[in-house]
Amino acid sequence: MGHFNWIQYLTQIEHHYAHVVTAVAVTAFIFVLGIYARVQLGSGEVAVVPAGKFSVRGFFAMVTEGIYTLADQVIGHDGARYVPLAASIFTFVLINNLIGLFPGMTPATDNLNTSFAIGMFSFIYYNYIGLKYEGFNYLKHFLGPVWWLAWLILPIELISHAFRPLTLGLRLAGNITADHTVVGVFHQLFPIGLPVPFYAMGLIVSLIQAFVFALLTLVYVMLAKAHDH
C-alpha cells in the first residue's frame, strides 16, 4: 500500500513493517479492553446483571453471545469450548478492519502476511483438534472411503486443506484492501458529506469479513471433528 500512514513518522520502523506495528497495537488494545471489561464485570450477582448501556463489557458480552450461538449451530453440543477461539479471531479481525476507516491508519488485515498468518493459525488449530479427538483416524480420512481410490483422493484432500489458510487470507486481505481503497479515494475527492455512505459500507464490510473468518474457522473445526461420527 502506498498511501499515507501515521506509522511512517516512527523513523525506527521501516514502512513494510507497518502492518506488524498495527497488529501488535491492536493486540495490546484488545488486551487492555479485556482487563477493563473483567473489572466492569465484577463478581457474584453483579456479574450476571446485563450492562445497562453500551460499554466495553457490553461489547464483549454481545460478541461472546453471538459467537456462542454460532458455535452451537455449526458444531453442536460441545461448540461452547471453541467460543474463546472464534471470539478472539472475530474481535482481532474486526478491530483491525475498523482501524482502516480512520484517516492515516492502515489495517493490518489488508496485508496478506497478517491475514495469511491468521489463516495459518486456524489451519493449525483445526488440524490439532482433528488429531486430538480422532488420532490416526483423522489422517485416514484423507485417503477417502474407498481404499483403491486413495491414490486419487489423497492429493485432492491435501491440496484442498493446504489452500484453506491461503483462501482465508486472500479473501480477508482482498476485501479489506478494496473497501478501504474506495473509502480513501472518495474521501480525497469529496472530504465532506459524500464519503459518509462509503464509511457505512466500510463498517458493514469490516463486520462481515470478521464474521466470515470466525464462521469458517468453526466450520473447519466441525469438519475435523465430524469424521468420528
Predicted regions located by residue number:
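Selective transmembrane helix interface/packing segments
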Residues: M1-H229
